[in-house]
């Protein structure tokens, strides 16, 4: 199943029409956010993606950020309209919330990528980040062993304290 705005709208029509997802009380925004997340997960599952990889980061009463594997990829802000909080109808929900995620052509309105391309890019970034972190960890292990060898017969605890002391006193152990 191709991931496009039209397909997403079909899912929204099937899952949300006639259901209560719009309201005026911001204290109930969890209900609204969960409805949006449910639709994303339904959409993801139908597209053969891991539905549990999708979540959101709640940013208080005004917005929630949709996430994929913990990475923010869409802003689902509950935007203000005419100075008042406006949650609106299903149509407003699709147009205002999901336009930041995918537009009618299946491309993100802010970076021109399709929904799938956005997820692929996140996967690539996470993989690259993991590689960088593994390289840093290996470098740190080598530095630790080098310092331990230079200090002689000392415990790992003493080496850690030595490193803390050097860093606290603005010596760079990485030069």
Question: What spans do the regions from the language model cover?
Answer:
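Mixed-charge, Lys/Arg-enriched low-complexity segments
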Residues: 2-23, 98-164
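Negatively charged, low-complexity tracts enriched in Asp/Glu with abundant Ser/Thr
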Residues: 3-65
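A sequence-composition feature that detects small, non-aromatic residues
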Residues: 14, 35, 44-47, 53, ...
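Intrinsically disordered, low-complexity regulatory segments enriched in Ser/Thr/Pro
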Residues: 58-131
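Short acidic DE-rich linear segments
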Residues: 170-175
């Amino acid at each position: 199943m191709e991931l496009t705005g039209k397909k997403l709208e079909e899912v929204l029509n099937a899952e949300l029409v006639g259901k209560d997802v719009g309201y005026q009380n911001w204290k109930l925004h969890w209900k609204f956010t969960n409805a949006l997340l449910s639709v994303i997960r339904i959409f993801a599952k139908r597209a053969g993606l891991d539905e549990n990889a999708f979540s959101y980061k709640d940013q208080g009463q005004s917005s929630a950020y949709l996430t994929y594997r913990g990475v923010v990829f869409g802003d689902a802000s509950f935007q203000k309209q005419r100075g008042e909080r406006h949650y609106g109808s299903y149509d407003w929900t699709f147009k205002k919330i999901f336009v930041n995620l995918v537009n009618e052509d299946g491309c993100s309105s802010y970076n021109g990528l399709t929904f799938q391309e956005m997820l692929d890019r996140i996967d690539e970034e996470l993989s690259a980040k993991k590689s960088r972190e593994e390289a840093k960890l290996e470098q740190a292990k080598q530095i630790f062993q080098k310092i331990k060898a230079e200090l002689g017969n000392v415990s790992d605890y003493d080496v850690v304290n030595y490193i803390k002391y050097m860093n606290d006193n603005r010596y760079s152990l990485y030069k």
